Amino acid sequence: MPRVKSNVVRLKRKKQILKHAKGAFGGRSKLWKAAKETVERGWRYAYRDRKNKKRDFRRLWIVRINAAARLHDMSYNAFINGLHASGIEVDRKVLADLAVREPEAFAAIAEQAKKALDAKVAAA
């Protein structure tokens, strides 16, 4: 089997890792082993936090919707239940945005949800 020299490939890989490590403190941006560990750890955190970001934003939207719904004398749970009962299909991201940027539109949606909830309770 012929001998394989990996000089070009190895240097290219090292260059990429050191490029990603730029901005790290001290030897973490200069020394190969430390830089490699730093970059790989950073990639692990980035992968994990891309998943956590979705959870965090959903939690933020729910907090905002809850606060806005309570201004209209409804809990978050009752508000969402009323939305389903009235057939309004708006996701939490849009609802949270409406609650912050357009309170009048959110108030109209909350009123419809409240009516649908009252009708649902009266029917039961």
UniProtKB/Swiss-Prot annotation:
GO cellular component: a single term: ribosome
GO MF annotation, one: structural constituent of ribosome
Keyword Nucleus on entry: no
One annotated GO biological process: translation
InterPro entries associated with the record: Ribosomal_bL20 (IPR005813), RIBOSOMAL_L20_CS (IPR049946), Ribosomal_protein_bL20_C (IPR035566)
Keywords: Ribonucleoprotein, Ribosomal protein, RNA-binding, rRNA-binding
RNA-binding found in the keyword field: yes
PROSITE patterns the UniProt entry points to: RIBOSOMAL_L20
Family: Belongs to the bacterial ribosomal protein bL20 family.
Cited function: Binds directly to 23S ribosomal RNA and is necessary for the in vitro assembly process of the 50S ribosomal subunit. It is not involved in the protein synthesizing functions of that subunit.
Identification of the protein by name: Large ribosomal subunit protein bL20
Native species: Gemmatimonas aurantiaca (strain DSM 14586 / JCM 11422 / NBRC 100505 / T-27)
